[in-house]
């Protein structure tokens, strides 16, 4: 009798994806973040589902319902903080996953890469709408500021913003629709993840050397299942340390004040994972220019397959490109820091320089260095 795992139509799909999948023998811990993102998504959907059972999406009761979850629901505080800090873990894994892709040239699988960028946008949209739901001061003003950016679109801007708001300001209609979208998007993300994996399994995984590894493959199970379980345990350990010891470490104290349209907080800033993009947005004095730079700061990832000039795929054997890559990482840390600072000297100029450097490294310096390294190969 043939093994059911190889014949059953449904189990066969799981078998080809997670059990008998041929994987390169040399993929490092940087390849763990895909599975960690999957776990993050599952944690977020489950905790989010239980939160939605007790949450009310009405301006009068939203803040109180979150308080009720934390005070009165059994382990509600745990579910709420796992969801809030789970988002932070999600973004840490996302940034590391994207960084791995950039470093090792995984973007040459361009269908997989482009769906990944769309996924990044979808997760960012979901996180933004989720941040609005507790209806604290930073929720309200964050929603007001970010949705208002769309008014920079010529001709249709103002109409578009009022259409999204469902009125002339962020109010009940806005909160209700944000809750609806925040609920549905993770399931759309799950579908996109399946497409992401479908395209990845068409080509097989990349590996640190960037070379074709068809001649040296090992089965995914047990080697990488065990490796992934180790990663998952570490992820859960870090998440639970965050949740149980300092759940508010990454949050904003302003969000413990109920939303008040008559009182603007002195410093409006998003969650830490959006600060780099927020810094780029604020670096440009023009509204439309800022919005374009904000969108392009993420959309630029789609240009990497076109901008790849090197004869080698991975940066493993390209020390000059490695150097520029780590300068880019340092630049992103700088932008994240600036995004959380008030708009005053010297932060404005630092932010502007860091923003220029960000686009210059990606569009100009990395491709130029790659061409130079190609010349070095001939020495």
Curated annotation (Swiss-Prot):
Primary location recorded for the protein, binned into one broad class: mitochondrion
Transmembrane segments: 33-53, 77-98, 113-133, 178-198, 226-246, 288-308, 320-340, 347-367
Alphabetical list of PROSITE patterns matching this protein: CYTB_CTER, CYTB_NTER
Pfam families per record: Cytochrom_B_C (PF00032), Cytochrome_B (PF00033)
Single GO term (MF): metal ion binding
Keyword Membrane among UniProt keywords: yes
Residue positions binding heme b b562: 83, 182
CDD domains for this protein: cytochrome_b_C, Cytochrome_b_N
Any one cellular-component term (Gene Ontology): respiratory chain complex III
Annotated localization: Mitochondrion inner membrane
Keywords: Electron transport, Heme, Iron, Membrane, Metal-binding, Mitochondrion, Mitochondrion inner membrane, Respiratory chain, Transmembrane, Transmembrane helix, Transport, Ubiquinone
Functional summary from the UniProt entry: Component of the ubiquinol-cytochrome c reductase complex (complex III or cytochrome b-c1 complex) that is part of the mitochondrial respiratory chain. The b-c1 complex mediates electron transfer from ubiquinol to cytochrome c. Contributes to the generation of a proton gradient across the mitochondrial membrane that is then used for ATP synthesis.
Cofactor, how bound (note): Binds 2 heme b groups non-covalently.
Binding site for a ubiquinone: 201
Organism: Neotamias cinereicollis
GO BP terms, alphabetized: mitochondrial electron transport, ubiquinol to cytochrome c
Membrane topology of the entry: Multi-pass membrane protein
Subunit structure: The cytochrome bc1 complex contains 11 subunits: 3 respiratory subunits (MT-CYB, CYC1 and UQCRFS1), 2 core proteins (UQCRC1 and UQCRC2) and 6 low-molecular weight proteins (UQCRH/QCR6, UQCRB/QCR7, UQCRQ/QCR8, UQCR10/QCR9, UQCR11/QCR10 and a cleavage product of UQCRFS1). This cytochrome bc1 complex then forms a dimer.
Keyword Glycoprotein in record: no
Name listed for the protein in its UniProt record: Cytochrome b
Residues holding heme b b566: 97, 196
């Amino acid at each position: 009798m043939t093994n059911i795992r190889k014949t059953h139509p449904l189990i066969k799909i799981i078998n080809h994806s997670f059990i008998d999948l041929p994987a390169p023998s040399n993929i490092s811990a940087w390849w763990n973040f895909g599975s960690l993102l999957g776990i993050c998504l599952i944690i977020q959907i489950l905790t989010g589902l239980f939160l939605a059972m007790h949450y009310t999406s009405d301006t009068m009761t939203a803040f109180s319902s979150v308080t009720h979850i934390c005070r009165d629901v059994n382990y509600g505080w745990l579910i709420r903080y796992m969801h809030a800090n789970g988002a932070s873990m999600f973004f840490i894994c996302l940034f590391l996953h994207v960084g791995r892709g950039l470093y090792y040239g995984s973007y040459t699988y361009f269908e997989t890469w482009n769906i990944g960028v769309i996924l990044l946008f979808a997760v960012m949209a979901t996180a933004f709408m989720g941040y609005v739901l507790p209806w604290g001061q930073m929720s309200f003003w964050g929603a007001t500021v970010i949705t208002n950016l769309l008014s920079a679109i010529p001709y249709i801007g103002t109409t578009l913003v009022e259409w999204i708001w469902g009125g002339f300001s962020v109010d009940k209609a806005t909160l209700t629709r944000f809750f609806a979208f925040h609920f549905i998007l993770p399931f759309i993300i799950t579908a996109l993840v399946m497409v992401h994996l479908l395209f990845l399994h068409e080509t097989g995984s990349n590996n640190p050397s960037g070379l074709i590894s068809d001649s040296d493959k090992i089965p995914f199970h047990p080697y990488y299942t065990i490796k992934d379980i180790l990663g998952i345990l570490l992820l859960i350990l870090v998440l639970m340390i965050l949740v149980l010891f300092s759940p508010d470490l990454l949050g904003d104290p302003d969000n413990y004040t109920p939303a008040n349209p008559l009182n603007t907080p002195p410093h409006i800033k998003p969650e830490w994972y959006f600060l780099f993009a927020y810094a780029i947005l604020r670096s440009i004095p023009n509204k439309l220019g800022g919005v374009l730079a904000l969108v392009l700061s993420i959309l630029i990832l789609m240009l990497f397959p076109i901008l790849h000039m090197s004869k080698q795929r991975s940066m493993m054997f390209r020390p000059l490109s490695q150097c520029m890559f780590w300068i880019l990482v340092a630049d992103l840390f700088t932008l994240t820091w600036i995004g959380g600072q008030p708009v005053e000297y010297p932060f404005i100029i630092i932010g502007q320089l860091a923003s220029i450097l960000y686009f210059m490294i990606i569009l100009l310096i990395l491709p130029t260095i790659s061409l130079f390294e190609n010349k070095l190969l001939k020495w």
